[in-house]
Each structure stands twice: as C-alpha cells, then as structure tokens.
Design a protein with these regions (language model features):
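Compositionally biased amphipathic helical and low-complexity segments enriched in hydrophobic
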Residues: 22, 408, 415-418
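A short acidic, helix-capping loop that chelates divalent metal ions and anchors anionic groups
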Residues: 36-40
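Redox-cofactor-proximal catalytic regions of oxidoreductases
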Residues: 6-34, 224
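Flavin (primarily FAD) cofactor-binding/catalytic cores of flavoenzymes
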Residues: 1-5, 9-13, 43-391, 414-418
Length: 418
C-alpha cells in the first residue's frame, strides 16, 4: 500500500479544525473492526478518524509504505502495470486506485475575476474563522461543507452570504432516530449502482446538508437563515467586482424539499412494512425552505464589504499521475462498478456510488472491497493459468533520486497495490 504521507493523511492534515464525520460513530465499520467506544451515536472528529484508521492499519498488519507519493502509473507491455514513486518503481499484475474523489478543490472560473481586495480560501486551506480577514464572507456552495462553514463563520461574528445551487436537504433526526440509521436499515444506503436509472447523475449528487455535532444541530438553509446568513442563488459570474447570482434559488430549494419528502416517504413505508411504525414517533414533515421574496441577484463585493470568499464548490479527483487512457473529458475514470474494463487488472475504490450509495463512506469500503477482490482474484487466476506466477515486485533500475518534497500536501495521492 503506497501512501503519499502518513496513514490517514488527509484526515490528519487537510481538514478544518471543527470537522466531524457526517455519519454516526456506529457506522464506522471496516472488515473485522467496528467502533467500540462509549459514544456510538456521536460523531468522530478528524483526529479521531485518523486514529481509528491508523489503529486498523496496525491491527491488520497493512503493508503501508508511508511518505511514498505515486508519480506515475503506466501499462507494462501486454499485462500489468509499472507504478513509479520518487525512490523506486513497482511492477504489478493488478493495481487498485484508492486515491479518492476529493484530491483537488474545484474553484469556478469566476475566481479569476475576484477583486484583489478579496482573499480566497478552499476548504483544504481553511482551518477556522480566525483565518479569515475581518468583514463579510461569501461562501460558494451549499452541500455539507458549504453549510457547515457558513454556520461556523456566521457564528464567529462575520456576515455570511451563501451562494446556493443544486443541493440535498437533510435533517439530522427523524422519528426519534438519526437519518443515517433510517437510510441504513431501510437499504437506501445499500442501493447498488446497477439498480438506479442514471448512475452518472447519481454519482454527481452533492453531499447531504448534515453536520455531526454533539447537539444534533441542523444546518439546512432554514437553520442558517435563522442565525442571519443571507441566502442567494448560484454564483454565475463576477463582472467588474460585482457577483451575479442565478435567479433559480426558489426552484432549487423546492426541488430539494421535494426530494427530502420522497426520502421520508421511503422511510415511512419501510417502517410500516417491517412492523416498526408503532414503536417510533409518528411521521411528520419539515417546514419548506424559506426563500426571500426577491432574492439578491447582484452583490458589489467591495461596497458590500466582502473580505473573503470560501470556495465550497466541491472537489475533483486528481489523475494527473495516471498514464493510462481511461480518464474521460471531465477527469473521471471510466469504470463498471470499480472495474476499469478498458484496463484489465485495474480497479477503483472509494468513489461516490462506486458500487453502492454508501461507497464513499468508511462504512461502504467493506462490501465494495469484497466485490472487487472477487473480480481481482479471477483476473489473477487467469494470469496464473497463462503464465504460472503473479504478484508485485520492486523494479530498481533507472529510478530517479528521492525527492525532498515527497511529503508535500499537493503531491500525487496514494495507490493501493495488489
């Protein structure tokens, strides 16, 4: 297992200070290990997640090579791959790409038109509200990251304007249970990629507006409006220091309300079918999202006192190191449930809705890994039949000297080798 930094590197070094998991602690389940602490309904901090993963790595004896960024993966003749690191190369029959979906913050083109007086941050750069200059803050994006940061920054005493596009409204609790409990037991989180009508669209769905807090506080748009956050539409562009927002805010909010209602209907139907309806509080529906009668469409950033912008506009994977033609025009690997069919022996894991709706969660790794190992083993069996041996081995010829910057946070990500 090749890791660019430390085990659980992103959780240790690339998260803001107050971040907690969106999923309850009981949902932290890995093959052979699950959360066994005294707060199963709580939410781990980033540091606690790092410890959880590191402990697991030690317990299973994972052969991790830390401080080993992968700088290239290329085909090796007719079979297998060559994986390059600053210090050496590996020849392998199969390769599992586990670098994740959140390597590179997505910053819209509008950033190039921001006035020089406005400081810009991505979630990977933001640590806490003290990092920000005095003045108003524009947060762009209203998925889980955007609404959490908008809440934190507003409560720090700064006026926040939140630019809202497509989003998934969530509520932490429903009928006396965590929403994730309902989605887990009802099978929503275990829906397979080959059971949905449009998997491409399903993989692009933003993360739900939830936060993991001790007080189970809500972070949907109504909760943010209640503490003074100004809600505007999607940021369309910036012209002459003026931010222009889409007029689709009401439509986006009505759609998010509709989808939340559908999810709650699914939960209610499951509770009735499985005899749980009478043992939990009765069904109810939440107030519709409150949208200003005349949402702001233009904001002069300088005159409006905007001192900083936080680009909570999503992340993209980084495959700049992958020299195999399997990446599409949008920078995503073409695959069938994690099996890269155009590159035999190459597999993908840890991506949104890879094989199931929970594929990008810690809890989703177990089932996906089991499925992919079956496919991988069948591939290796075929190679062994033809060649008589399989495996991965170091190749030390013509390898460059180790780089001194191999632990930089912007180095290429880890790759798992089998």
């Amino acid at each position: 297992v090749l890791e660019r930094g430390e085990v659980a590197n992103s959780w240790r070094n690339e998260r803001w200070d107050s971040l907690r998991l969106l999923t309850p602690n009981w949902q932290c389940r890995l093959p052979g290990r699950q959360y066994d602490g005294d707060d199963p309904d709580g939410f781990m901090s980033a540091a606690e997640v790092a410890t959880f993963i590191s402990t697991y790595s030690t317990e299973i004896g994972a052969p991790v090579h830390t401080g080993t960024p992968v700088t290239g993966v290329r085909r090796s003749g007719n079979n297998g791959y060559v994986v390059t690191t600053p210090a050496e190369e590996w020849q392998c029959d199969t390769v599992v790409l586990a670098s994740g979906a959140f390597n590179r913050p997505h910053v819209p083109e509008a950033a190039t038109a921001m006035p020089a007086s406005v400081r810009m941050f991505t979630p990977a750069q933001y640590r806490n509200a003290n990092d920000l200059p005095a003045g108003g803050v524009l947060v762009v994006g209203a998925s889980a990251t955007g609404v959490q940061l908008a809440q934190e920054i507003q409560l720090s005493g700064r006026q926040v304007t939140l630019a809202v596009g497509e989003h998934v409204r969530g509520r932490r609790m429903y009928r006396g249970r965590d929403l994730h409990w309902w989605m887990d037991v009802s099978g929503v989180l275990h829906e397979r990629y080959d059971e949905v009508d449009d998997i491409v669209r399903a993989r692009r769905v933003p993360s739900m507006q939830l936060a993991g807090t001790d007080g189970l506080s809500e972070v949907d748009l109504n909760a943010l409006t209640a503490i003074g956050v100004q809600i505007v539409g999607r940021l369309a562009t910036v012209r002459e220091n003026v931010a222009l927002f889409s007029g689709s805010l009401r439509n986006k909010c009505e759609l998010a309300d509709l989808k939340l209602g559908r999810l709650l209907n699914t939960i209610d139907e499951w509770a009735i079918t499985n005899g749980l309806d009478d043992s939990v509080p009765p069904p109810h529906r939440f107030e519709p999202t409150v949208v200003p009668s005349s949402p702001t469409l233009m904001l002069d950033l300088e005159r409006g006192g905007i001192a900083a912008v936080v680009w909570a506009s999503g992340f993209r994977p980084d495959y700049s190191w992958l020299d195999v033609e399997v990446v599409d025009a949008k920078g995503m690997i073409r695959h069938d449930g994690g099996v890269v069919t155009e590159a035999p022996g190459m597999y993908l894991i840890g991506m949104p809705f890879l094989r199931r709706r929970n594929s990008s969660f810690i809890d989703g790794a177990c089932d996906d890994a089991q499925d992919l190992v079956v496919a991988l083993a069948e591939h290796l069996d075929g190679i062994a039949t033809d060649r008589g041996t399989v495996g991965a081995s170091r190749v030390t010829d013509s390898v460059p000297e180790p780089r001194t910057d191999s632990l930089r946070s912007d180095s290429p990500p880890l790759t798992e080798l089998l």
